[in-house]
Amino acid sequence: MKTFFVKPKIYYGRNSLAFLSTLDVNRVCIVTDKMMVKLGVADKIKSYVTHTVCTIFDEVEPNPSLDTVKKALAIFLDDGPDVMIAVGGGSPIDAAKAILYLSDEISKQIPFKRPLFIAVPTTSGTGSEVTSYSVVTDTERNIKIPFTDERMMPDIAILDEELTKTVPPTVTADTGMDVLTHAIEAYVTRDANEFTDMYAEKAIQAVFTYLPRVYRFGGDMEARGQMHLASCMAGIAFNNSGLGINHSLAHALGALFGLSHGRANAILLPYVIQFNAGLCDGTAAISPAAKKYASIAKMLGLPCSSTEEGVISLVAAVKYLQKVLDIPETLAAAGVDRKELDDCMSFIIKSAREDVCTAGNPKEVRPIDFTHLLNWVYEGDQ
């Protein structure tokens, strides 16, 4: 028996933020970051809930730390809001999820009413507004901790593309490639099904169609709107099917070398596709993952006279997209130091093997496979 979980309720399109003015509540807590305050986005959100007592926590960093989450939690518990609104990229939403999860754990000892949780993404990348996943950083151990619990799922998501129009090209590229990685991994994971395939396929098509457009022309609101929906669709897909080692390695590399999550995923993607498909060991003809990758190639209208050709075509298409988006092809080109990578190799492999995403990977991965893969991603095709 298979299952497919769909939540939250989604308001989308231009001016969908106006939904906030319909809230009949007394206390609101907004979780965001300094940039959202500087750009006036936090005040815009606040303007829709003027009839409430509103607290703004704006200290979420790009990779939310456990310390920040704990600090926000103390304010959150003291404030006792009726509604929590997470506004920003994946980091504020992930932080809000962690706050909600920890407050729910605390409520087992101290009575605390769960607030309505509204997620308002301002980038098109993580899909965090429709997932029960969160990633926080343990700065003491220098690792990213991905975890999942249905209690972290937002109750409402608001997808207003107007909030994405100030996102700079580099961030647009990185977050857009995160969408593509989510969708492709969700499509080939062990628990993929007919429903997740449907959402993943739509997201993949949208990325190849609209991401180059919005990267070149940031004011293309049609493209921004479609990428916002693609991010959400990919999130729905992977929340049900899981992810794979692309994300496991990206979590470790991002924490150690300061790479943005989307950029780390983008650099890894062509290599992970080839590894999972069996192009490296000659098993592509019988690999279930290879057949799924080839299906993507066929859907995109790429050469696909055989399974192997389909995989090769998809890899070439991903690499071309990277080039269009000015994303480096290797870890070396991204500025990662060779010696530092070697020194951290065992730690990266251990982190990736323990990462919750690895269980969904379509192919078993041995420690030696991780080593070869990381060396390959560092050096590129020689």
Task: Walk through the language-model features, giving the residues of each.
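C-terminal and late-domain segments of enzyme folds
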Residues: 173-233, 237
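Short, amphipathic C-terminal "tail helix"
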Residues: 340-382
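ATP/NTP phosphate-donor binding region
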Residues: 1-83, 331
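Acidic-aromatic/histidine active-site loop/patch
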Residues: 90
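A glycine/threonine-rich phosphate-anchoring loop and its flanking beta-alpha core
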Residues: 8, 101-194, 288-295
